Amino acid sequence: MLSYITWFFILIGFVTVTSYLVPVLLAAFKWGEQDLKAKYNAKWALVSGSSSGIGRAVAKKLAKQGLNVVLVALDDDALKGTYESLKKEFPNQQFRAVGCNLGKSDHEYDYMPIIKEATKDIDVQILVNNAGYIQLSAFFRSTLQKQLTNLECNMMSHVKITHHFLSNMVEKGLKGCITFTSSQSAFFPAPSCSSYGGGKAFLASFAASLAIECYTYGIDVLCLMSGPIQTNFYDNQPKLSFFKFFHAISDTPDSAADIMLNGVGRITWRDSSLFTIFSRLVVKIVDMNLLVQGIARGQSLSSDFKNHPELR
């Protein structure tokens, strides 16, 4: 006969796993596509990191719904190409290309005045904070400035952009939504990209708290926990063997964009892939202290750890 203590732990395990899996199953089998233009009576969206990958896919899907889109990304050929391509594909929609460096903010350069000037005559109600990049190396082997630049792009730019447009929405009584592109590394140890993982963890926590603050104003907040995606995300990084594994299990940008847009207003944290869901279940079952110690002791067995001294 099972003791009360045994039943107690069974109940804890059941509630822990079930409360996570129910939204996952609803998202997979019940929740369908949403028309965000109609849902929020919106005209304009802004997507950062919109020149490629998930950002470009989201911008295209929003334009397909009839929304005008502000494209924010580095001022390069990729942004120009995306801008021209979307204008050609959606001639009835308006697009604005805003080229700026979201990783740089100091007394000499500030991207916020550029974004504010480009959007001063419109109401942005769909805000997609997607810009980000990874930098692979042991934390101490990279310069402090490189780490701060990574955090500025992946974390602080989202805070600054969100503060501006959220304030406008609340002041004018507009409904809308705000999304953040986070990562599996937000809740799972990410050695060799600790600033990246730390920044993504901030976004997840920030989004959860912000969702509660925004609820009474009719503004939905979602944080996408992305897994490996078939993009140029890992270009210009060390050629690591686990990238081959990531490529084999990676999702398409279109799939991640669908998952993001379908989850808005229905859930706050949305895991975008089987890899992310599996990782989430691991940290629900295995305590973080044990997980960290296990990874720390086992990393020396990895060929990447042995062959790439910059990672250790």
Give residue ranges: language-model regions:
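Residue(s) in the substrate-gating loop at a strand-loop-helix junction
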Residues: S183
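SDR active-site lid
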Residues: S205, A211-V283, M288-L291, I295
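Conserved glycine-rich cofactor-binding loop
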Residues: W44, S51-S52, D75
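Conserved glycine-rich Rossmann-like NAD(P)H-binding loop of the short-chain dehydrogenase/reductase
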Residues: Q65-T82
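Conserved mid-core segment of classical short-chain dehydrogenase/reductases
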Residues: D106-E117, I126, G132-L148, S192
